[in-house]
Amino acid sequence: MANLADDLAATAAKAAASPSYKQLKEDFVSNLSGGSVVEIAQVCAVAPVVSLLWSALQARQTFFKPYNPLAFVVDFLLNVGALLLSVTLYSSVPLLLNILLLVPAAAVYFSLSDNPSARRKKPQLPPNAQSKASPGPPGALSTKPFLTNYRGNMMVVTCICILAVDFRLFPRRYAKVETWGTSLMDMGVGSFVYSAGVVASRPVLKERADGRSTPLATRLVRSLRHSLPLLALGVVRLLSVKGLDYAEHVTEYGVHWNFFFTLGFLPPFVALFQSALRLVPSYAGLAILLGVLYQVVLETTELKAYILAGPRTDFLSMNREGIFSFFGYLAIFLAGQDTGMLVLPRSLVPRDGAPGTTGSRRRALVLRLAGWSAIWITLYLLCTDYTYGAGLTVSRRLANLPYILWVVASNSALMLSFALVDTFLFPAFYKAQDAKAEKEAYHTATSRVLQAYNRNGLAIFLLANLLTGLVNMTVRTLDVGRIPTMGILGGYMAVLTGVAVGLDMYNITIKL
């Protein structure tokens, strides 16, 4: 009897000493150091390379028109499947995956005809685009295919990673870094904010085109209408995580804070900063100024030590990562808004001031994107280089100046890559003379899958979060092997894509 009691006591002690599954999951995403910037760039490069292959199929073979079930399957495999492979089975060899995608892209482009002149032949305009008699001239702003492809790919990768990170197949170096370093998911968070900034420039451009200015009070009221749904989602996520005893990574945003709160507080602060344009007439200038000031405060006060090692005794200290990193995300948003001011206007006048042809305006757009990419990359190198620069280290937890510059430089370069693909393979589609022709030309040059993700991005992101929670509550993700992991992730992305494309087909836009 005594032996039985001893055995039970030993078993109970062993169970108490062994970590719970929740603790194992929290440890699985904690204390990570990330990977190299070069490898992350190679993974990110898969998206524009896939765009090149898709565009070659469309420009040379009109493969995705009409958009039948086969076209959808190929569209899904390229724009979702290839990105899924880049962070799972090909995560250790992203350069190889890029090569495997480039080879068929080149083959498709050059195999159209044995006649060299036919190979260089530009895609023909759609019938509507060739007509100049259609009513309704296009407006001052346009929705460019390369911008949709960029934002759609960003959303696809984000949705993949938020679930894939819970499986062992997803490399730990791609998961969010604890404090110092770079990772793919750190880039993804910043890219989401940057992309939101790009599209947020549209109402500002409309105001300028109409020659009007909205008072600050009106801008604040409008911004609050955008903020309230996001803040409500943040509260719902907070209550669900606490109520379901879901695994948490406290040092990511804090005890109560989450990414929805960060997104929700951006609009009113951006509305305030718009008034500062009278002093600093550039969103990029405001972004750099804010980032530099924030970094100076981090380096010259106790703020950095407080964020990284302070006790959690009150609401501010419990959520210090989310609250103070907000300034970094605000700078990223403003930088994205500056890019939007560049890429959204229909006509970009060359530097010589002459109206120019369609080709010259498109070259001007690409050159200015290239110029800004070079500027951001140079600033990032000056900020992080130990020999010729400041020698600072990237920290997503702080959202410090190196992190801001890394995110903006990478996204500027990515957008430039998509713009080059667009310019090279679909130059003729931008000669449309009316709104109807331009719309048809846009659909011809844009992936239906990426267009669907771009159209209802925030709603799909919310659905992805719900499905991620559902999978984690029903599956012990740490115990799943490679093949079942791919099956779960593939099914999850198929559901998200099906919902996104279904909403797009029925012309439904969910605004949050």
Curated annotation (Swiss-Prot):
User: How is this protein positioned relative to the membrane?
Assistant: Multi-pass membrane protein
Q: Where in the cell is it found?
A: Endoplasmic reticulum membrane
GO cellular component terms listed in the entry, alphabetical order: endoplasmic reticulum membrane
State its Enzyme Commission number(s). Answer: 2.3.-.-
Known InterPro entries for this protein? PIGW/GWT1 (IPR009447)
The pathway is: Glycolipid biosynthesis; glycosylphosphatidylinositol-anchor biosynthesis
Give the residue spans that cross the bilayer: 37-57, 70-90, 92-112, 154-170, 180-200, 253-273, 279-299, 323-343, 364-384, 401-421, 458-478, 483-503
Q: Main site of residence? A: endoplasmic reticulum
> Its domain of life?
Eukaryota
Q: Which residues are glycosylated?
A: 31, 507
Q: Name one GO molecular function term.
A: glucosaminyl-phosphatidylinositol O-acyltransferase activity
Looking up Pfam families in the UniProt record yields: GWT1
Keywords of this protein's UniProt record, alphabetized? Acyltransferase, Endoplasmic reticulum, Glycoprotein, GPI-anchor biosynthesis, Membrane, Transferase, Transmembrane, Transmembrane helix
Q: What does this protein do?
A: Probable acetyltransferase, which acetylates the inositol ring of phosphatidylinositol during biosynthesis of GPI-anchor.
What PANTHER family would the database entry show? PHOSPHATIDYLINOSITOL-GLYCAN BIOSYNTHESIS CLASS W PROTEIN
- What does the sequence similarity comment in the record state about its family? Belongs to the PIGW family.
Mind telling me what this protein is named? Answer: GPI-anchored wall transfer protein 1
Native source species = Chaetomium globosum (strain ATCC 6205 / CBS 148.51 / DSM 1962 / NBRC 6347 / NRRL 1970) (Soil fungus)
- Lineage summary: Eukaryota, Fungi, Dikarya, Ascomycota, Pezizomycotina
Please name the gene that encodes this protein.
Answer: GWT1
